Amino acid sequence: MTRLSFTVLIFLAAYFGSNIRPNVATLDPKTVCYYESWVHWRQGDGKMDPEDIDTSLCSHIVYSYFGIDASSHEIKLLDQYLMITLHDMEHFTKHKGNAKAMIAVGGASMSDQFSKTAAVEHYRETFVVSTIDLMTKYGFDGVMIDWSGMQAKDSDNFVKLLDKFDEKFAQTSFVMGVTLPATIASYDNYNIPAISNYVDFMNVLTLDYDGPWAYTVGHASALPEQLKTLEAYNKRGAPRHKMVMAVPFFARTWILEKMDKQDVGDKASGPGPKGQFTQTPGFLSYNELCVQIQAETNAFSITRDHDNTAIYAVYVHDNHAEWISFEDRHTLGDKARNITEQGYGGMSVYTLSNEDVHGVCGDKNPLLHAINSNYFRGIVTEPTVVTVTPVTHTTEHVTDIPGVFHCHQEGFFRDKTYCAKYYECKKGDFGLEQTVHHCPNHSQAFDEVSRTCVDHAKIPGC
């Protein structure tokens, strides 16, 4: 690749919109799998090692995280004993299979150091060269730059840093990626047209739109919000095929303020309790949650949005209720199909250690399988049910709270207080699940006999 001056390069990128980076990444949908090295130190089913990664389900596996040395500005190992003495990095690249093995540099605590390193030409050179040396020595195929919290004042220096990587990557097959935030206030801190021309893909952190830091409950990663973020970057110059959408393999949890107030937007008193492995208030890995649901099915009420792109559970125990926003194989499969149909580049998963990699709840890696199986063959979304065939009724006990609907058997049931609202109850992965539907017109009522929406005057009490 012919080198151009930085100024001319940026001009040509903006004017022609051409790709500066060689196209070394696959054009097929990507599944970018983040692996946190520190999960080696967990116990029991929470522990994970590189050998536990099913690389056939990942196009890229990302070893997280590396830092930057404050004195030398070289790439920094954050756990030398694990990474070198225990040969963890070598195990990671040895077991990569056909996936691209990458390193992630940065994270939430590295913004200030990135700012200092990227501001000086000599520091940029040192950091990039040391990164390439490490990747070459241990068999990595590329790097993800995760400059979390970058400020507008650093925008030009970020592009200069990517330009330095581009210079040193010339005539190599190294993969270059960056991570972008989902916060609206941060969008314009990034020179998206310039960045797009330097990278093979952009990992957009479409996570945590709601969480226990806010004292109201809500879907942590609802698809409409995720799509708004992707569209915002697309309007700023990011090609759709270069963006991968981050999805959580974890749940966000709250303690409800009132046990009978369980809808999206209702108040919470704080975060849910720590999980057995993750040990973080308001946070559960999927493998922690699925074990809990299977062990106490009767204490959980699971509600799925009518479009199948969001799901939550309410867990009633010890005189309080937890509200849990999570993903399952159905929501993730729908998201995978939806975004690839729109031309986006795939998904990144946060993180492999949160997946059921050991198969403690059933088959191994159910979430990864759902994502990959839906990239290439579409699943027809079921329309809102107006007429349905008779169903087989099965009865299960669910902890009841006065004034709150719970599924006790499969079927369709009208809400007791709002006749245009009705519930579909059917078997899911974790027992009975309910999906909330509404009649097209608020003056209608749902008729449980005909299973259609009719004029409310035809239904006694409506």
From Swiss-Prot:
State the InterPro entries in the record: Chitin-bd_dom (IPR002557), Chitin-bd_dom_sf (IPR036508), Chitinase_II/V-like_cat (IPR011583), Chitinase_insertion_sf (IPR029070), Glyco_hydro18_cat (IPR001223), Glycoside_hydrolase_SF (IPR017853), Glycosyl_Hydrlase_18 (IPR050314)
- What transmembrane ranges does the database entry give? none
Domain Chitin-binding type-2: residue ranges: 404-462
Cystine pairs annotated here are 33-58, 439-453
What's any one GO cellular component for it? Answer: extracellular region
Q: Which GO terms describe its biological process?
A: carbohydrate metabolic process; chitin catabolic process
Family according to the record: Belongs to the glycosyl hydrolase 18 family. Chitinase class II subfamily.
Q: Could you identify this protein by its name?
A: Chitinase-like mite allergen Der p 18.0101
Tell me the organism: Dermatophagoides pteronyssinus
